[in-house]
Amino acid sequence: MYYRDMKKKYVIGIVFAILMVSLFYLKRENNTRALFSWRSEVISEEADELIEFINDNKFNTLYQEFDLDDVESIQAFGNKTDIQLYHLCGSPDWDIERIKEEILAVYKVNQDITTNIKGLVVDIEPYLKADWDKNKKKIMNSYIDDMIEANEYAAKLGLEYFLCIPYWYEAGNVDRLVKDGCDGLVVMNYYKGKELEHLSDEMESCFRYNKELVTAFEMQEAGKHDLSENNTYHDEGLGAVNEIYEKIYNRYPRIGLAVHYYDVLK
């Protein structure tokens, strides 16, 4: 009797352990691992190579700048992969009407294809405006208002709306953006060794409002776009990025990963 009870407890313990491990890996599999790709023609000219790179590096999400007029190429690419697709777009000179045009264009593409573009990843960078230093507060408030309106519009069309932001926005601005201006943040977290420290405000807001948070790593070589060695993992490679992200994930498993960008990695 004692032996049977012990054996039963042992079996239950093994089953429980297997279940926990399975849930852990399922959670990891569902966590965002995104790749940026800015060149729209890559999905037609290098589709197989891109998909192979995605699979080899265990990405499950692609932030791709699509040519929204080339519906045939978007459909053909979508037929080859089940990766989650988001339209990557944006420019400092985009006003709310231009942003809404892009949202509507994505919606219309989805009506014409069986592949689904889940939403938009919008990289506006208002701090690149010529008068930023003189009118920072006004520009930022206008940007936040635009993002709130754009997010509402995207939601009405059934599209997710993510924002790319730098790690240094003031906490109050981050909170306003997260609360009403997006479904989640992709933080361009370009400062080696301080990735977690620089996510503190974004974590507080995203966790409070139950929004997604993704930390992005730069892979371009130092010297380009004013990048220094402190900003990029170009020399260290994806292996180092994965090690850093693993430490972040172990503490905060809700945080996803993004890598910027495909053309400098292939």
Model-predicted regions and their roles:
Residues 23-68, 162-167, 256-265:
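Boundary/entry segment of secreted carbohydrate-active catalytic domains
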Residues 2-17:
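N-terminal Sec-pathway targeting helices
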Residues 50-53, 61-91, 134-161:
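Aromatic-lined substrate-binding rim segments of carbohydrate-active enzymes
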Residues 192, 212-266:
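Substrate-binding cleft of secreted/luminal carbohydrate-active enzymes
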Residues 40-55, 98-113, 169-178, 199, ...:
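Short, acidic/polar
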Residues 63-66, 106-140, 255-259:
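Active-site groove signature of glycoside hydrolases
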Residues 59, 64-67, 128, 171-200:
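Aromatic- and acid-rich polysaccharide-binding/catalytic face
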Residues 38, 84-94, 144-173, 212-223, ...:
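Aromatic-lined carbohydrate-recognition surfaces of secreted/lumenal glycan-active proteins
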